Amino acid sequence: IVYYANATAYLIDPSKVPFTSIGAIATSLLFLFGSYFIYEVIVRSHLGKNAFIFSTLIFILLVIASWGSYQLFSDRASFIHIGAILGTVMVGNVFFGIMPAQRALVDCVRRGEKPGKEVAELALQAKNRSLMNNYFTLPLIFTMISNHYPMMYAHEKGWLVLVFVGVITATARHYFNQKH
């Protein structure tokens, strides 16, 4: 909201794209919800059934989103946008994937039925969504605190720094998962 309330100060970099405030806000919302829509299409498709393919594809899309946000918005806003995408996906994963699968499973148990194929598919989607949330946690925290460290975002290759830090933090999370 802060970035939208004063878009000319926070969101817009006129040397990149000479947006009006309304244009920048509309582009930002389209970028955010468009990214979430693409994620949902992938997670619900056959590509979302294989954790490796799914994770690889999401990583590639996040690299593209990182680069794209750096082309459109101020450097600082770019980091915040990637964090907002991660956060939106994480919330969507819980409300539109994990919780419905949990409800379906609990309903089967309450009725004394064995979960069928549909519930199994929901459970697989929920597992992959939960895995994404697990790996997105540290990169999300990094994007949240990044505004306090201009040396991370205040140059033309800041989008690449964002990608590398995302890889490093996700790798750290993977290491932690394997050891605990």
Predicted segment positions?
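Polytopic transmembrane helical bundles with strong interfacial aromatic enrichment
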Residues: 1-180
